[in-house]
């Protein structure tokens, strides 16, 4: 995570500034404000601002005038009830603003979550840095034989080295040509908005991303899942740690009822009940497709 001395000084200056407030403050999140949490080889996640805490969720749910009830146990129980029964608007009262540095191909997955406010670094106005995501050897993998969207076994030895060399060489060559097209001093050069088209998808971009807690939980449920692509999953895992410090009751409920939970179809529930009753249920008698049956077996640990 190469932050320049100027960037580090700016972060230190931001963290040194304090101000009196009547706003709700989350002590756990205050410790993360402005700090860069490294992700991948050049990326990071920074908390720029936040609004609300666990008590704000309860306040919204009760439409109360003050803080939630004085009983911490009651607040935690209410939050777990709201999460368990799929309530959304109380969680939307909390918001988080992040500064994220990430590869472009990760950003294209991320931006599919359309329930956030985003402002991205503009390559029309500025020249992008020479920073590319190059996966570690253990993450250079073949295509999965059973999942069109996933990876299989990691490539080994010379094959992995060959792929990594191609990635590094292509990235360097594309950036060299990008610089050459923009032009040197005394040359007119190509417009930045056109020169950027030649850059590869593993170059890093940056954005500010603001989202409410309900939609953030939806993002994390999908992107922190073991089936998510590694490169976006590590960002989601970093964000999970931040959210756990920000709203610990809400995050624990999210872990229990979303992240660590599973959804079973009506046929799966019926099959499970029959199994518990002692019946030998097979894929053919379950009413499930082969893929559904395989997923069901994974859930029940068979």
Swiss-Prot record:
This is Flavin-dependent thymidylate synthase. The keyword Electron transport does not apply. CDD domains: ThyX (cd20175). Its EC number is 2.1.1.148. GO terms for biological process: dTMP biosynthetic process; dTTP biosynthetic process; methylation. NCBIfam families: thyX. The keyword Flavoprotein applies.
């Amino acid at each position: 995570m190469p932050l320049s001395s100027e960037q580090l000084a700016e972060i230190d200056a931001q963290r040194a500034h304090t101000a009196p407030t009547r706003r709700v403050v989350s002590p756990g999140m205050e410790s993360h404000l402005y700090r860069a949490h490294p992700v991948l080889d050049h990326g990071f996640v920074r908390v720029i601002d936040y609004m609300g805490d666990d008590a704000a969720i309860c306040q919204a749910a009760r439409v109360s005038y003050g803080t939630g009830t004085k009983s911490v146990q009651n607040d935690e129980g209410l939050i777990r009830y709201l999460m368990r029964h799929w309530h959304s608007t109380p969680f939307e009262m909390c918001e988080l603003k992040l500064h994220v540095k990430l590869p472009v191909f990760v950003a294209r997955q991320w931006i599919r979550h359309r329930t956030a406010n985003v402002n991205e670094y503009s390559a029309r106005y500025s020249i992008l840095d020479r920073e590319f995501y190059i996966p570690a050897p253990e993450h250079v993998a073949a295509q999965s034989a059973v999942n069109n969207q996933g990876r299989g076994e990691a490539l080994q030895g010379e094959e992995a080295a060959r792929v990594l060399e191609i990635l590094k060489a292509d990235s360097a060559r594309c950036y060299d040509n990008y610089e050459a097209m923009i032009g040197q001093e005394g040359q007119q050069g190509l417009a930045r908005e056109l020169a950027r088209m030649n850059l590869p998808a593993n170059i890093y971009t940056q954005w500010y991303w603001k989202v409410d807690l309900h939609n953030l939980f939806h993002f994390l449920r999908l992107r922190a899942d073991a089936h998510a692509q590694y490169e976006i999953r590590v960002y989601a895992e970093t964000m999970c740690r931040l959210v756990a410090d920000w709203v610990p009751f809400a995050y624990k409920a999210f872990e229990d009822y979303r992240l660590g939970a599973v959804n079973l179809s009506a046929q799966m529930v019926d099959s499970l009940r029959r199994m518990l009753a002692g019946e030998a249920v097979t894929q053919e008698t379950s009413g499930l497709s082969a893929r559904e049956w395989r997923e069901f077996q994974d859930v029940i640990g068979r």
